[in-house]
Amino acid sequence: MESEARVSELGRQGDPIRSPAKRDPARKDRILAAAADLVARHGYHAVGMADIGAAAGIVGSGIYRHFDSKAALLSALLEQLMDEMERSAAAVVAQADDDRDALERLVTTHVRFAIEDRRLLQVYYREAHHLPEEALRGLRRAQRHYIEEWVIALAPLRRELSDAELRVVVHAALGTTQAVLFHHSGLPADRLAELLEDMGRRCLGLPERAPTE
């Protein structure tokens, strides 16, 4: 009996130790991309977790291994957007030669986001109010940081404006890109970007660019 017990104990000790299943980052990205597309097209309330999982190729409840609720998914989606926008803004400002160059780069980068990440920005403008209060506060805080990059660059160029006026001008410049989010112009992306950048620059009061040959 003692020998059998020892063999049994050794058998248990020899059993392979299973590590917890790892989350696949690519799968999480697929979920976020599917959520952005579905929520942008149908609205937050009309889309369920099962719909998002199916669109991402996730079977059954696998989506809950990454997000415990639809609100958590929306929060992650918009947090990812603002993180990327903040990083890009900081990077282009750091590369700029002067304040005017910084604003030029900010306009170009923001227009690129509006065209390339149209679905994400649609969700941001239409559905952010569905976030839990704490997540919404964090999103608004990130938005203020993003706008601050623009205000800091604009202030030396528009010294006649007060701080409040500078922020109005920046919001107006950012608002020029919203038309592309909800209106399909049919224009080629390059031409659309050119128009949007021109409108943004005009809002900021930047001089016209010299025509390219």
Where are these regions (language model features)?
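N-terminal intrinsically disordered/low-complexity leader segments
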Residues: 1-26, 210-213
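Generic hydrophobic, amphipathic alpha-helix propensity
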Residues: 27-35, 52, 77-81, 85, ...
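Short, structured motif recognition centered on aromatic/hydrophobic residues
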Residues: 36-39, 85-86, 103-107, 114, ...
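Hydrophobic alpha-helical connector segments
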Residues: 76, 90-116
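Amphipathic alpha-helical segments used for helix-helix packing
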Residues: 114-134, 182
